C-alpha cells in the first residue's frame, strides 16, 4: 500500500510507504519514501531497534508485506525474545516465511577478520533473502556496528553505499539504524552515515528536570514533504506511538446538545449547561471545591446512564470514594454498574507522553461519554512549559476527536486575589472556564464562582457566592453590594455610589 506526496505531476511524485506506526505517518505526510533508505539515528536506548522491528511488524500484519531484518549486534534469539514484550509474535512470522532474520552479528569467539573489508557476501545474502521471501521492507541494525569492526571508514562508507544502491535497485524500502553520541550533536557517530541515506530520522531521549522525554524529528525526506520539529513519542506495550500534535486538524464536529454540570444553578449560569463535546476548565485555589464539581459532573453522567472516566493525580481512590460519599455521591455503586472507571497515579510515576498514552488507551477501551482530570496542575510539576502545553493539546484534541466532554481542574497558586490562567496557554484550548475563589466579606471567608468564558453561548457574567453543604455546592445570589471581588480587596458599594 502506497501513497503519493503532495505536489508535482503524478508520474514524478515520490511514492510513500506507510509505516503503520501510530502518529509517525502523520508527521511524514503518509509514510517513508518507497524504495529508498531511511537512517534512524539516536543515542543508546532511544528505541532505534524497536522502531525498525515495528516497521517490519506492521508491514507484515497490516499490509501483507514480508520483511528482512539484518542484525549486526543482537542474536536472532535475543531479538525474538525482546520483541515478545510488545506483543509481537515474530517467531510465528519467521515460521510462516513472512519474516527472515539475517544474522550478521560478530563472531562470539572474537576472531579477527583478515583481508580488505567487503560487503559483497552480505549483499548477495540479503538479495537472495529478498527474492526468496518476496520482501518489500528491510531493516538493518545497526550501521555503527559495521564501523566498529573495521578501521577504514572510507572503505566502510563505500561498501555501505554499494549496499544501499543495490537495495534501491531491487526496490525495497529500507530503514537503517545508527548510533550518535549526543542528543543534539552530530547526526551519527562516524559522520558519514547520513550522507549515504536519502532520509534521516532522529530519535531522542532527553533528560528534562530529572525525567526522560522521548522525541522524534524528521531531519530530511529527500524529494518530499514532512512536518518540522520534534514530536513526543512513547514505547508502550504495543511498540512506538508518536503524538503528532502539529498534525491535528480542527475538523471535529460541533454539537449544540447540552449536558448538565450536575449543579442546576451552575447550568443556569452557563445558559443551560455545557455543550456535549466541550472542554471545561475549573481553576481555583486549594479547597475551593474543584473536586466537588468534578464529582457532580460524574454523578450526572451516572444519573443519565452514561459512562465516565476519572484520572486523579492528587488523591488516592480510597480518598476520592470517601470524599464523594460525604457529598452523597456513591462512586463505588457507579463502578459496580460499569459506568465509572477511576485511574489514580502519581504525576511523577512516568513522563507526560506516557500519561497521555495511558489516557488514550483507557478511553479507547472504556469508551466513556465524559472524562475528568483532577488535576492538570499536578501534571505540570517538574516538566517544561512546552511539554505540558503539548500534553494538554494532546488530551483536549483526543477528547474532541472522540466527542467526549472533558472536565479538567487547575489549582491556582494564589490563595486569594486575581491569578493568571494563561501561563500555560490552557485558557485558549478550553471552551468553558469556571473561576473559583476565596473572598473575605465582613471578616469572614466566603467562596465565589464566575463563568469566566463560554464559547458559543450566553453565560452569566456575575460573580456569585456559593457554599459547600452535605448535598454539594449551593450557588447563591451575586455579591451585589461589592465590587473588586476577585482582586482580593472587595469594596462595599454605598447607595450613593450605586446611584
Curated annotation (Swiss-Prot):
Phosphorylated on serine and threonine residues by autocatalysis. Has a 4 step phosphorylation cycle; the autokinase acts first on Thr-428, then Ser-427. When Ser-427 is modified KaiC switches to an autophosphatase mode, acting first on phospho-Thr-428 then phospho-Ser-427. One of its GO terms (molecular function) is protein serine kinase activity. ATP 1 binds at residues 45-49, 85, 220-222, 224, 226. It comes from the Bacteria. Its EC number is 2.7.11.1, 3.6.4.-. The modification Phosphothreonine is found at residue 428. Pfam families: ATPase. Residues 1-243, 257-499 form the KaiC domain. Keywords: ATP-binding, Biological rhythms, Hydrolase, Kinase, Magnesium, Metal-binding, Nucleotide-binding, Phosphoprotein, Repeat, Serine/threonine-protein kinase, Transcription, Transcription regulation, Transferase. It catalyses: L-seryl-[protein] + ATP = O-phospho-L-seryl-[protein] + ADP + H(+); L-threonyl-[protein] + ATP = O-phospho-L-threonyl-[protein] + ADP + H(+); ATP + H2O = ADP + phosphate + H(+). The modification Phosphoserine is found at residue 427. Binds 2 Mg(2+) ions per subunit, one in each domain. Mg(2+) is required for hexamerization and phosphatase activity. One of its GO terms (biological process) is circadian rhythm. ATP 2 binds at residues 286-292, 327, 447, 453-455, 457, 459, 461. Its cofactor is Mg(2+). The kiaA gene has been eliminated from Prochlorococcus during genome streamlining. It has been suggested that the central oscillator in Prochlorococcus does not have to be as robust as in other cyanobacteria because the former live in specific niches of the Earth's oceans; they divide exactly once a day and at the same time. Thus gene loss, and changes in kaiC function compared to other cyanobacteria, can occur. In the homohexamer the 2 domains (called CI and CII) self-associate to each form a 'donut' layer; the compactness and local conformation of the domains varies over the cell cycle and impacts function. CII has the autokinase and autophosphatase activities, both CI and CII have (weak) ATPase activity; CI has the clock pacemaker role. Homohexamer; hexamerization is dependent on ATP-binding. Component of the KaiBC complex. KaiC interacts with SasA, activating its autokinase function and leading to RpaA activation. Belongs to the KaiC family. Central component of the KaiBC oscillator complex, which constitutes the main circadian regulator in cyanobacteria. Its composition changes during the circadian cycle to control KaiC phosphorylation. Autophosphorylates and has a weak ATPase activity; ATPase activity defines the circadian period. This is Circadian clock oscillator protein KaiC. It comes from Prochlorococcus marinus (strain MIT 9313). The gene is kaiC.
Amino acid at each position: 500500500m502506497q501513497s503519493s506526496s503532495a505536489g508535482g505531476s503524478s508520474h514524478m511524485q515520490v511514492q510513500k510507504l506507510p509505516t503503520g506506526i501510530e502518529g509517525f505517518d502523520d508527521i511524514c505526510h503518509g509514510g517513508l519514501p518507497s524504495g529508498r533508505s531511511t537512517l534512524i539515528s539516536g543515542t543508546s536506548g532511544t528505541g532505534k531497534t524497536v522502531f525498525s522491528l515495528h516497521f517490519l511488524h506492521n508491514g507484515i500484519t497490516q499490509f501483507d508485506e514480508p520483511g528482512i531484518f539484518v542484525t549486526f549486534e543482537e542474536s536472532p534469539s535475543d531479538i525474538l525474545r525482546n520483541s515478545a514484550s510488545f506483543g509481537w509474535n515474530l517467531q510465528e512470522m519467521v515460521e510462516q516465511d513472512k519474516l527472515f532474520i539475517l544474522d550478521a552479528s560478530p563472531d562470539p569467539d572474537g576472531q579477527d577478520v583478515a583481508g580488505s573489508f567487503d560487503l559483497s557476501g552480505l549483499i548477495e545474502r540479503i538479495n537472495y533473502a529478498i527474492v526468496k521471501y518476496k520482501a518489500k521492507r528491510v531493516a538493518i541494525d545497526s550501521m555503527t556496528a559495521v564501523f566498529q569492526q573495521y578501521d577504514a571508514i572510507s572503505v566502510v562508507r563505500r561498501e555501505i553505499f554499494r549496499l544501499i544502491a543495490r537495495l534501491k535497485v531491487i526496490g525495497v524500502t529500507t530503514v537503517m539504524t545508527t548510533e550518535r553520541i549526543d542528543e543534539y550533536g552530530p547526526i551519527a557517530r562516524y559522520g558519514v552515515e547520513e550522507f549515504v541515506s536519502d532520509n534521516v530520522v532522529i530519535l531522542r531521549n532527553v533528560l528534562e528536570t530529572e525525567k526522560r522525554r522521548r522525541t522524534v524529528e524528521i531531519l530530511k525526506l529527500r524529494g518530499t514533504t514532512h512536518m518540522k520539529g520534534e514530536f513526543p513519542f512513547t514505547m508502550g506495550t504495543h511498540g512506538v506511538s508518536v503524538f503528532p500534535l502539529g498534525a491535528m486538524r480542527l475538523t471535529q464536529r460541533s454539537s449544540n446538545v447540552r449536558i448538565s454540570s450536575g449543579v442546576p444553578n451552575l447550568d443556569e449560569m452557563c445558559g443551560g449547561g455545557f455543550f456535549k463535546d466541550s472542554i471545561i476548565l475549573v481553576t481555583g485555589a486549594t479547597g475551593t471545591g474543584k473536586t466537588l464539581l468534578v464529582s457532580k459532573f460524574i454523578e450526572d453522567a451516572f444519573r443519565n446512564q452514561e459512562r465516565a472516566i476519572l484520572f486523579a493525580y492528587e488523591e488516592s481512590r480510597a480518598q476520592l470514594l470517601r470524599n464523594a460519599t460525604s457529598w452523597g455521591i456513591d462512586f463505588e455503586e457507579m463502578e459496580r454498574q460499569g459506568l465509572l472507571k477511576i485511574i489514580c497515579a502519581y504525576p511523577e510515576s512516568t513522563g507526560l507522553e506516557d500519561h497521555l498514552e495511558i489516557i488514550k488507551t483507557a478511553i479507547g477501551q472504556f469508551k466513556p461519554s465524559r472524562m475528568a482530570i483532577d488535576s492538570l496542575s499536578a501534571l505540570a510539576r517538574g516538566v517544561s512549559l512546552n511539554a505540558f502545553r503539548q500534553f494538554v493539546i494532546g488530551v483536549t484534541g483526543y477528547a474532541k476527536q472522540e466527542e467526549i466532554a472533558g472536565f479538567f481542574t487547575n489549582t491556582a497558586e494564589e490563595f486569594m486575589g486575581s491569578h493568571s490562567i494563561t501561563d500555560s496557554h490552557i485558557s485558549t484550548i478550553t471552551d468553558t472556564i469556571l473561576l473559583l475563589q476565596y473572598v473575605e466579606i465582613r471578616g469572614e471567608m466566603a467562596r465565589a464562582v464566575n463563568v469566566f468564558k463560554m464559547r458559543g453561548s450566553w453565560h452569566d457574567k456575575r460573580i456569585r457566592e456559593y457554599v459547600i453543604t452535605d448535598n454539594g455546592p449551593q450557588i447563591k445570589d451575586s455579591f451585589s453590594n461589592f465590587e473588586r471581588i476577585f482582586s482580593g480587596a472587595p469594596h462595599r458599594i454605598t447607595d450613593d455610589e450605586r446611584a
